[in-house]
Amino acid sequence: MAKKILVIDDSALMRRVLCDIIDSDIRFQVTDRAKDGLEAFDLLSRNSYDAVVLDVNMPRMNGLQLLQELRKYKIPARVMMASTDTKEGAKTTLDALELGALDFVHKPDSAVDCRGENFRREFLRTLNVVANSKLPTFAAEEKLSEEKGTVKEMMKIINHHPVSVSGSKIVAIASSTGGPKS
């Protein structure tokens, strides 16, 4: 069964190009389209999708604002950013990833370049990864936020009390052998 995809872009031409690319692959099917974040928010609050392809610059509600609203209302979505602004290391890209986007592709400036094989291959590869990833949950994020608060409280206590009673100095080394579970 094909993965259900929502495409959000203010340009009708770009929506058409992205939908054509997605629908050309039997693994995916565009089931809905939106021209801005407000339309998309309405769709996402009523429907579930295997992946969401999201532009950044749009009227009424841009892509970053939509990500903020999804987080605020705890609406889970597997989001892939596709914008001329999303380049590796760009502030917009980092902001989107911090707000919950799972991955990104740099969308060429022209529809002609978007129809090129290199973009098509990269776009579909990224979409496949996003559509098959674990749906983000907000419980893990809340737990991490609580843990950060606990660490901050411990640091206040440690920094508040004098350390050396005997006059001896010690060196403590801490190490982590793992990270968050994937």
Listing of model-derived features with the role each one plays in the protein:
Residues M1-S182:
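Strand-loop microenvironment adjacent to phosphate/nucleotide-handling motifs in alpha/beta enzyme folds
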